[in-house]
Amino acid sequence: MYTALADQDAILKQLLATGQRTDFGKDHNLEAVKDYQGFKQAVPIRDYELLKPYIEQIKQGRHNVLWKGRPMYFAKTSGTTSGTKYIPITKDSVDNHFNTARNAFMCYMSESGNYASAAGKMIFLSGSPELERVGDIPTGRLSGISNHLIPKYVRTNQLPTYETNCIEDWETKLDKIVDETLHQNMTMISGIPPWMQMYFDRLTARSGKKVGDLFPNFNVLVHGGVNFEPYKAKLFDSIGRQVDAIETYPASEGFIAFQDSQKEEGLLLNTNSGIFFEFVPAAEIFSESPTRLSLKEVEVGKNYALIINSNAGLWGYNIGDTVKFVSLNPYRLVVTGRIKHFISAFGEHVIGEEVEHAMLVASAQLGARIVEFTVAPKIA
């Protein structure tokens, strides 16, 4: 706990030391900021629309806009109101993405003793690694960019091949992935749950076997991107047996947290990897003057909107997620939803976490297995 708080204090100081020499830092007088209280006064919370003018300057070739130099990559995401978003990944922030994924796997192997999981073939179900250039900066989906960050010692066991990964049409790509993996010694499979389910269905359709029978040494499933629980029963039914699952919390804006233990609830917050975290009570996020809390001020069981400041050049940035701490020593959290994912046709304010919990209870009572779902208010 105390190491995490010290790390956060040190990161804020490092961010301010570099940030004050950027256009953003000069616009917000970061040179005069001495502590977190001063930081909150100088740097307002912002969404992508308020960040966009700085991103446009970077696209036009300007240096030292949000962070020193220029980004190594733009991670491209689809925004609901802002259109396509271009999130910078810098030379300083790039290690956050790969090293955190590595740390999650290392924690798993250290706790479980399952070192054999690293000896076989591993598949990362991801977007295309082919990148375009925007403002002369390599640009693509985060999962595609991540393929360029994987070191050679991991590539030896990585599937699918680069050529297959570059296929844009998902159905064609999935068939090719099945071709390449069907007779391999797969020990680890990674991806978002819906993609893994489609892969498992295609494997079973081709082989007539459960995934666990097809890959007898498969024992680790790594997932992230969406809540795992609604998909869990169907995925394990497709596998045909239990395997260990490692949950991760990657985002284009940074690798936020990862499951460091198979025995404890929640994901370990990534407190020493170039991100200074802030938390806003979820009910206040759309107010004009929301309460902003540092890590040492959070409480267990309360819903917070997650705000990040990072060496990617993100400042007071609202990534749109809500989280809830389940432990403060160490700092472990669960993702409870998106700040805009709620239904309130009659002022009921039903959030994503509540919908998912209700679905889990209902599916358990009815013996149902959920593959995918959509929720919306229907007023007759």
Regions found by a protein language model. Give the residues of each.
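Conserved structural elements of the adenylate-forming
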Residues: 89-111
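Conserved AMP-binding loop of ANL adenylate-forming enzymes
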Residues: 108-152
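Short, glycine/acidic-rich hinge or "gate" loops at secondary-structure transitions
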Residues: 28-34, 116-119
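Conserved pre-ATP/AMP-binding loop-to-beta segment of ANL
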Residues: 59-75
